[in-house]
Structure formats: C-alpha cells, structure tokens
Design a protein with these regions (language model features):
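Post-BTB helical module
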Residues: 1-84, 94, 98-99, 103-109, ...
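Enriched - but not universal
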Residues: 156, 174, 225, 235, ...
C-alpha cells in the first residue's frame, strides 16, 4: 500500500520490519515475490540478503557438498552421523524439478567418495586377514562395517539421482575385495553383501540400467558372498527386508540370457537344499526359468537348443 501511494517512509518502515523478523518458508516465497513485483529500489536488497546467493557460491558448491558428505563419512559420533545422513539424503532427494537454478552434488564428487570408501574397505579387509598382532581387531571390524555402510549410503544417493550404472561395473570388478571378503568371518563382513543386495534390488526394480554383461559380472563376483552372508544379514539387522532382497535378486537373474539363468539357478537349487532359510528363497525365479526353458520355449532354431540338464537316477 505504501509503495502504491508513493509513501517512501512507509515503504522503508515495512522493509526494516521485514528485515528484522524471521520468515517461514512460505512467507519467504511471498516476500521475494512481492518485492520482485513492486520493483522497489536498492533498499530491498538488505531484506533479501538472507536468501541471496553470492555469485561465487555456484563455483564452490561442489566443494561444499564434498566437505559435508566427507564429514558424515568420517563422523565420530554414530548418532549424529545417522541423523546427518538422513538429513542430507532427504535434502538431496527433494523434488525441485521446476527449479532450474538448483545447485546439486556432481556425479564426480559422489564417485570420488565411492572410490575412497572402497579403497578404505579393501585396506580394512587386508588388515583383518593379516597376521599383525599389534592391530586392534575390534577397531578393524568396526571400520569394515562403517565403510560398507558408507558405500551403501552413497550408492543410495546415486540410485536416487539415476547415476548408479557406473557403480555396478565398479563393484563387479572388485575381485580382490571379494577374495578378501571370503576370508573374514561372516559376522564381521555381512554388511558388505548388503551392497550387492542393494544393487540387485535397484536392477530388479528397473532403477539401475546396465548391460547384461555387467549384470552377470556382478553376480559372478558377489553372488556367492551374498549366499554365504544372507543368514547373518537378516538376523543381524531389522532393516534387512528378506522379501525385497529375494525379489530383487530374482528379477536380476531373470534379466540374463536363458543359459546364464540356468547356470545361476541350478547352483542356487543345490545350495538352497543344503542351507534352507540361510539362503535366499528365489524359487519364483526358478519357476519362471523352468517355464521358459521347458514349457514356453522360444527359439529361432528349436532343434539346436543349447540348454543342457543333467539328471541323476536314484534307486527307489
């Protein structure tokens, strides 16, 4: 009103009032919109300082994100670490698709942190399998769990931003890590297998899109470890959703060529018979493979089927 009637003192008084009081987020949008609409001179600048970004912020944004994420990965207080993980996850996932000015964490920053965590995890496993008696075993085991959890968190962010395809390839290539993993007691290492489960869930839901060669490669490298750790995974944490993992693993297997499905599922069949509930129950995938292979066969050259099944006759 003061602006409309050219009452300058009234305008100044209103601006001083707005500058001195807190705003809710809704009020913030109203203030910005109002001042832009009225096109008041530089006197409005002071009011908007609390929401105005410095031009250099855009250039430094990725450094800020890197420092924040690194701080969480290295935090000493577990409770504070969990709270800040949840906070940053929520902020990074906020839907602001209509805001073209949004500054977001870069793919390079996230993958830099992934590589750093994998290197730390590799070092922890090397120390855990070593013979140096001077090392604090309890601290090493704690670090293994922590680094695995760190990777899960970064991968979750990557999946949310549809940037995780490259990580599947990286994880599939961790042959040395998988070898060391097999030498560490299950109770200490099962958090690592949750990374594999996380990727299978993402692939199974169609959130991670990678070529079939990479899908098979990640299973070739890590599926045995997931089988071995599955019992501990579901017993050690209420956060582990058995059905979610089994469905994700099933769908991932069923995206492979039929011969690879056969190889994976026949191996699972034998293991499940011996391990029972300590092995993922993916019999739905087995049923679908069975029907594809023997009932609803599709082949350009049916007479040249390459499927090979070996059956043993047991005496009755």
């Amino acid at each position: 009103v003061s602006a409309a009637i050219m009452f300058d003192l009234g305008v100044v008084s209103c601006l001083e009032y707005l500058e001195s009081i807190p705003w809710t987020e809704d009020e913030q949008e109203e203030v910005i919109s109002l001042l832009e609409h009225l096109q008041i001179d530089d006197s409005a600048t002071e009011v908007l300082l609390r929401v105005s970004s410095d031009p250099s912020t855009a250039d430094r944004a990725d450094d800020i994100f890197l420092n924040l994420l690194s701080g969480i990965l290295q935090a000493k207080d577990d409770k504070a670490r969990r709270e800040m993980k949840a906070l940053l996850s929520r902020l990074l996932k906020e839907d602001v698709s209509n805001d073209s000015s949004r500054l977001d964490v870069s793919k390079d920053t996230l993958y830099h942190l992934c590589h750093k965590c994998i290197s730390s995890l590799l070092l922890c496993l090397s120390e855990a399998t070593g013979s140096d008696e001077k090392l604090d075993r309890g601290a090493i085991i704690s670090n293994i769990t922590r680094e695995a959890d760190n990777i899960q968190w970064i991968v979750d962010i990557l999946i949310g931003k549809k940037m995780s395809d490259e990580f599947v390839k990286i994880w599939a290539e961790q042959k040395e890590l998988a070898t060391l993993h097999s030498k560490v007691p299950t109770v200490y290492r099962h958090e690592i297998s949750r990374i594999t489960a996380q990727l299978c869930i993402g692939i199974g839901r169609g959130h991670i899109l990678v070529p079939k060669e990479i899908r098979f490669s990640v299973l070739s490298t890590w599926l045995e470890a997931l089988y071995e750790d599955f019992g501990w995974m579901r017993r050690a944490s209420r956060a582990v959703d058995r059905k979610l993992i089994e469905d994700g693993l099933s769908q991932t297997i069923l995206t492979l060529p039929l011969l690879q499905q056969q190889s994976v599922l026949l191996n699972w069949f034998d293991r499940f018979l011996n391990k029972g509930d300590d092995c993922p129950n993916i019999q739905k995938a087995f049923e679908i493979w069975w029907r594809r292979a023997f009932i609803r066969q599709y082949s350009a050259e049916p007479e040249n089927s390459q499927l090979q099944i070996t059956l043993s006759d047991y005496p009755s």
